[in-house]
Regions:
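Short runs within selected transmembrane alpha-helices of multi-pass transporters and secretion channels
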Residues: 65, 133-152, 159-167, 192-208, ...
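Small-residue-rich hydrophobic transmembrane alpha-helices
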Residues: 44-107, 140-159, 259, 272-336, ...
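Transmembrane helical elements of multi-pass membrane transporters/channels
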Residues: 13-32, 132, 166, 199-203, ...
């Protein structure tokens, strides 16, 4: 225990700012939904459609940016700030090209929005909101890339503060532009989109300014300025980033398709499913935050070639995530019905949602452990296996099992939710197995 205590403290110190920043994102999402919903039902429906379309893009961009963190942490572990700064330049190129490819696809899809089965009366709301949110993705990519760089230097507080202030600006912008306060025009859903765009521009510029002007990053700036762009180095970043982006994209896609299947049952089932997934994000938020903190620790020790400490850092992260999963499970068991009533008072929806509390609890440990060992792998930068593990777990197991349990077995939403557990409990041991394979190549001294 005494050997693990420093690792507990360090992982918590890194993870808590990430968690606080993510709580801010969730609060902003709730505020957006409530304000748009109170403005007009058509605006809420249009926002839900566009946000669901861009949700997968957001996860792909976010996952892709995660490839940079362990590379930077490894350089920092060796004291190579010049090299870490140069790596940021290559990562910005790689992330920019990846985002442009995704936005090109989304631009093509824009011209087929009217073929996606949405009510015709929503299209005048959907089209401008789609354009604004799509444009904001460029700034999301820039913020994510630079934030993963600062996180990799063990500075997780900077990203937290910028996220929190950006979210506050977004909420203020919503009030001014959705409803038209004072000299500001009443723009409804478009106002919410513009507020999101402006807040994302602010966050991107703010984190760039921190790296460009803060004294802490002076040595990194020297490396950034002195390092020329290199296609070889950019491709190297891509090989470490693309597997993580695709892994998170497939995981997100499995959850999205599970929602679609719930909608095949009826509207109350879809509503209940969405409510429980939203509640479940509270657990996911903490698992991923502290998993990211553990990943930074692992990468730092990999950079030092200290594999004994890699093992200790991973074990400490596992203990923290198990404790978080236990706390989340108890919270959902005790307060689940209260959380559900916060979202809806419809008795049919509430009844279905309450029946999903136990399946929600079941998947907490699978989720925590797959996040633990996925992040441990990410910390070692041995990430190629993450693609096939995600494909097997989420595409081969989760989605077909959801259909089989939900429909032929007549378990409906309960079956679809249980299939999520099957996917997560498939991913967790596979990630663990791959991490152990990496450790066997580097026996502790």
């Amino acid at each position: 225990m005494s050997k693990l205590l420093p690792h507990y403290k360090a992982t918590l110190r890194l993870g808590i700012p990430i968690a606080i920043g993510q709580i801010g994102v969730i609060i902003m999402g709730f505020a957006d939904t409530m304000m748009v919903g109170r403005y007009a039902t058509e605006a809420l429906a249009s926002a839900s459609f566009v946000n669901s379309v861009f949700n997968l893009i957001s996860f792909l961009i976010m996952g892709y940016s995660y490839g940079l963190t362990p590379l930077v942490s490894a350089h920092c572990g060796r004291g190579e700030k010049h090299e870490a700064g140069g790596l940021l330049k290559q990562a910005l190129m790689a992330n920019g090209l990846f985002t442009l490819v995704l936005l090109t696809i989304m631009t093509v899809l824009y011209f087929y929005v009217d073929c996606m089965g949405q009510p015709p009366q929503l299209l005048p709301h959907i089209r401008p909101y789609y354009i604004v949110i799509g444009t904001s993705m460029l700034f999301v990519a820039l913020f994510n890339a630079v934030r993963q760089f600062t996180d990799g230097t063990s500075d997780t507080a900077t990203g937290m503060w910028i996220l929190l202030t950006g979210n506050a600006l977004n909420i203020i912008g919503n009030v001014l532009l959705i409803y038209g306060v004072g000299p500001f025009p009443e723009l409804g859903l478009l106002g919410a989109g513009l507020s999101t765009l402006f807040s994302r521009i602010y966050m991107a510029l703010a984190i760039v300014a921190v790296v460009a002007f803060r004294k802490r990053y002076a040595a990194y700036r020297t490396g950034f300025n002195a390092t020329p762009l290199s296609w070889r180095a950019t491709r190297f970043v891509n090989t470490k980033s693309l597997p993580i982006g695709l892994q998170m994209g497939m995981e997100s896609g499995a959850f999205t398709f599970s929602c679609i299947m719930a909608g095949w049952i009826d509207a109350p089932s879809l509503a209940a499913f969405q409510v429980m997934l939203t509640i479940g994000t509270l657990g996911f938020l903490f698992y991923y935050s502290f998993g990211s903190g553990m990943s930074i620790r692992v990468a730092t020790f990999v950079g030092l070639n200290d594999w004994h400490q890699v093992r200790l850092a991973t074990r400490a992260g596992q203990h923290i995530l198990c404790a978080m999963a236990t706390l989340s499970s108890l919270t959902f068991l005790i307060l689940g019905p209260t959380f559900i009533h916060f979202f809806t008072h419809d008795p049919t929806v509430v009844g279905i949602a309450v029946s999903l509390i136990v399946p929600l609890i079941i998947y907490q440990f699978g989720d925590a452990m797959q996040i633990c060992y996925a992040n441990a792998l990410r910390g070692t930068s041995q990430v190629m296996s993450m693609m096939w593990i995600a494909f097997v777990s989420y595409i081969v197991v989760n989605i077909p099992a959801g259909y089989f349990l939900g429909f032929p077995c007549h378990l409906k939403t309960t079956g679809i939710f249980l299939a999520i557990s099957l996917g997560l409990f498939t991913a967790a041991p596979l990630f663990y197995w791959q991490f152990q394979k990496v450790l066997k190549k580097h026996p502790a001294e």
